[in-house]
Amino acid sequence: VISQNWLHGVFLDVKSFFVPGTGFDTGRELVNRVVSDTQKTTISFEAGQAGADRADPSVNWMATKGDATVAYDPAFTPSLPEFNPATGKVNDVAVDPGIAIGHELIHATHIMAGQISGLSPVNYTGVDGTPHRAKFDEEARTVGVGGSPRADDITENDLRRQNGIDLRNNYSDYAVP
């Protein structure tokens, strides 16, 4: 579990984290991928931000392994569309800070592996069954709603399932044509 502390830093919640089979296997695997990779991910505090990028802009992040940078502010919790299965409705809900950093660490694993799935728009179906269009294939893939996934992907929605949080319905920047 990734948690926010009162100093606006990030720490790993030790409770249940190192004990396999406690329901936190997806988060544990994500952190393991980040810390055990030969490539480096640097996380820095940037007020009002959550984002991931390649450390060296000259690296082709779609085909070449490279180091990643993550900008993160635990107090930055924008409202995101979550699908509530009990009501069948999508509601904008402030994102859990652990899910926010998890989303960016997923991007970091893609960058470190040289497997960013693309920066082209992609059409997909949201969790609620409605059509959406993401500005970038990589974002739909990272959320777990579409794009060009790989068999071993960890997604934001996997982390949400693990923590009992409603799934993110979509990552939309554009209207569907």
Where are these regions (language model features)?
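Auxiliary, metal-adjacent structural segments of Zn-dependent hydrolase domains
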Residues: V1-T77
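Extracytoplasmic/secreted proteins, especially bacterial periplasmic and envelope-associated proteins
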Residues: W6, D25-E29, D96, A100, ...
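Structural recognition of the beta-strand scaffold that forms the well-ordered cores
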Residues: I43, V70-A71, I106-H110, T142
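Extracytoplasmic/secreted cell-surface and envelope-processing proteins
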Residues: R54, S79-F83, H110, G118
